[in-house]
């Protein structure tokens, strides 16, 4: 085995950008073992990934011991030990980087060296539509009647698609609000998004799509972890999770700067309206399983409110719709897919 020239240690928390949960301390190498020491400010599931020579980070490593895995309790000097370094493929490389992060079950994917994250949403049933008392202010007829919806498991983007990811796939940036690659892409129509999704699927081998309206609302509500909030993750403190008319300054903001909802999803309310796959139609009181919306229509659904929306426009049940060939500076989207299996054809 060639002598290790450098081992880089990267300790971050990818489960939340608004508050660090993992803090860096130190690492030591002795023989064939590596020991990482880190701090954790709250109980969490922890995993470790490795990147070889500046490449992509691997799926979580197995065979580790110490403060790793499920339900790690907080502490200032927690340790993780890898006893069999030579068994890591590529360990004889000149440079290794280790990533210690909150294990939120995310699928970490790349276009070139640009990472993006797809979050698992466990299937389940929920009540779709406006759950405010009937007749309450800012309740609209298109949000009722409420109805039971049952969904299979799926994945959804942790963030709105960024300008960096769009540019990596499409080679250009159509957005009005620029200056930071982490800004969500906007000024994209529903039809534009279909072209992007087809190209991204071809590049990565994964079958991406837009979420259905029901999938979007279930995820915004927090899925099976929902606490029954009116807005993503909150009941009244809209500013904690949503960029809207009173805190946005009249423009979009980089993704992931506010708090996430119960599923670890960011900006499900506010920032940009998000395209869904469905044509617009009125609700029915009938229970549905994996609804796809009507086969034809005039307008496509948008969800979540935007930076110019009032607070009630960012609720988990607020609906919007528009012609599929229009893209404005407050229209964006996030990705969805059925499974983590790649298309090998």
Task: Specify the residue positions occupied by each region the protein language model found.
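Short proline/glycine-enriched turn/loop motifs at strand-loop junctions of beta-rich domains
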Residues: 40-45, 161
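Aromatic/hydrophobic beta-strand junction motif of beta-rich domains
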Residues: 36-40, 82
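Boundary at the C-terminal end of the N-terminal hydrophobic targeting segment
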Residues: 17-21
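Sec-dependent N-terminal signal peptides
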Residues: 4-14
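Conserved Ser/Thr-centered positions that define the repeating blades of beta-propeller domains
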Residues: 49-51
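Extended beta-strand/loop cores of jelly-roll/beta-sandwich
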Residues: 103-214, 299, 320-345
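Functional-site microenvironments in short loops/helix caps that host divalent-cation chemistry
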Residues: 127, 132-133, 179, 184-318, ...
């Amino acid at each position: 085995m060639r002598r290790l020239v450098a081992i880089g240690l990267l300790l971050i928390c990818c489960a939340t950008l608004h508050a660090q949960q993992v803090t860096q301390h130190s690492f030591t190498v002795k023989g064939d073992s590596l020991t990482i020491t880190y701090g954790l400010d709250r109980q969490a599931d922890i995993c470790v990934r490795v990147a070889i020579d500046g490449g992509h980070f691997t799926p979580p490593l197995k065979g580790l011991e110490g403060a790793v895995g499920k339900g790690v309790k907080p502490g200032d000097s927690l340790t993780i030990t890898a006893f069999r370094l030579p068994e890591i493929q590529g360990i004889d490389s000149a440079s290794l980087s280790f990533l210690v992060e909150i294990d939120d079950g995310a699928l970490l994917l790349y276009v070139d060296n640009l990472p993006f994250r797809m979050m698992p949403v466990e299937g389940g049933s929920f009540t779709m539509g406006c759950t405010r008392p009937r007749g309450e202010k800012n309740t609209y007829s298109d949000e009722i009647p409420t109805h039971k919806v049952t969904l299979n498991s799926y994945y959804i983007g942790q963030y709105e698609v960024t300008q960096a990811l769009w540019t990596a796939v499409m080679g250009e940036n159509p957005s009005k609000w620029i200056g930071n690659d982490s800004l969500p892409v906007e000024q994209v129509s529903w039809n534009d998004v279909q072209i992007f999704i087809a190209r991204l699927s071809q590049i990565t081998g994964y079958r991406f799509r837009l979420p259905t309206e029901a999938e979007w609302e279930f995820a915004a509500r927090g899925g099976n972890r929902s606490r029954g909030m009116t807005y993503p993750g909150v009941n009244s403190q809209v500013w904690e999770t949503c960029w809207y008319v009173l805190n946005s300054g009249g423009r979009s903001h980089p993704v992931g700067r506010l708090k996430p909802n119960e599923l670890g999803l960011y900006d499900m309310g506010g920032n940009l309206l998000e395209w869904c796959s469905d044509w617009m139609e009125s609700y029915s009181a009938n229970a549905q399983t994996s609804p796809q919306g009507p086969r034809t229509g005039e307008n496509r659904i948008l969800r979540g409110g935007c930076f110019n929306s009032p607070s009630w426009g960012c609720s988990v049940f607020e609906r919007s719709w528009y012609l599929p060939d229009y893209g404005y500076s407050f229209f964006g989207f996030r990705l969805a897919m059925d499974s983590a299996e790649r298309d090998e054809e």
